[in-house]
Amino acid sequence: MYFLKRFLELVPIFFAISIIIFVIMNSMPGDPLLQMRMQNPRAMTNDPERMKELREYYHLDDPLPVKYFTWLKSVLTGDLGYSSMYKSPVIDLIASRLPNTLVLTITAWLIGLVFALPIGIISAVKKYSTFDYATTIFAFIGISLPGFWFALIAIIIFSVNLGWFPVSGMATYGITGFWNIFSDRVRHLVLPAFVLGLVQVASWVRYIRTSLLEVLDQDYVRTAYAKGVPDRKVIIKHALKNAMIPIITIIALDIPYFFGGALIIETVFSWPGMGRLMYNAVISSDYNLAISCLMFLAIITLISNLVADFLYVMVDPRIRMGRKGA
């Protein structure tokens, strides 16, 4: 019941976000039909009657509320419209690009978690040590510099100079055999996934360190140390478990960041995913595709909230019991 309630609370938020995105996209300058004519002048007619029919077909002259509900009805039935840039149904484009982005973002998220968690814990336990100072410097540098800068540096060092990884793309054409294809995909994945994941490590390390330090200063942790409980057990069983709630908040709610960050990383590495698709849709004023991509990001954000709630309850069941008693 708790998760059902949380899910139902997100439904009106979803519709509110859809209204905001739809209004913003429809407030942008430009005429979709004019854009379609510029992209494919041979396929578009100059006949005024035909243009009028097309405007009626796409509901371009309808009042904004009518346009919104017409669009919403189509979306809820699985019709996301037609891409004027790719000359293909939007839902087919998303279906073909989404798996590529999921592979990239999930790998990057796991890389970020694998690096940030131990570094943050060690930095908190060894407070004011050389390791802690070095970690702090690294974190501030990582937070200050943009992701595309790291991407370009990584390409120059590991692709151009060392030749360890491909410069761009997701696969090398002409390769046959399962293991050859698999290893080739991994080589293409390593660089963009590490760049996307390690950029986020900087901020995660700071949150993990701060959260764990607050718990390590609590009386019950000092009591455990005074009773002779081994350091590893105190940190993992007592301190880290109670420090996990704010850490979960950041790590779970940063999932949309990876999809947003993929927009830049996929563009730099020419990775054929949702980020690059969204970038191309925006710069080419492909309204149907741009709106659908933005709605996809909104859905990912809402799902991240549900994931965070689920992890909260796993770490501390009292959260669910507290909500029931409220």
Task: For every predicted segment, state its role.
Residues H59-L117:
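An internal, D/E-rich "acidic patch" concept
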Residues M1-I21:
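Hydrophobic secretory-pathway targeting helix
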Residues L10, R97, T101, I137-F140, ...:
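Residue-level signal for discrete positions within transmembrane alpha-helices
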Residues I20-S27, K73, F138-S168, V195-G197, ...:
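Membrane-water interface segments at the C-terminal ends of transmembrane alpha-helices
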Residues F14-V66, L162-F182:
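Hydrophobic alpha-helical transmembrane segments of membrane transport/permease proteins
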Residues I21-M25, G30, A151, I155-S159, ...:
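Juxtamembrane/transmembrane-helix interface segments of polytopic membrane transporters
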Residues M1, L98-F131, G147, T172, ...:
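Alpha-helical transmembrane segments of integral membrane proteins
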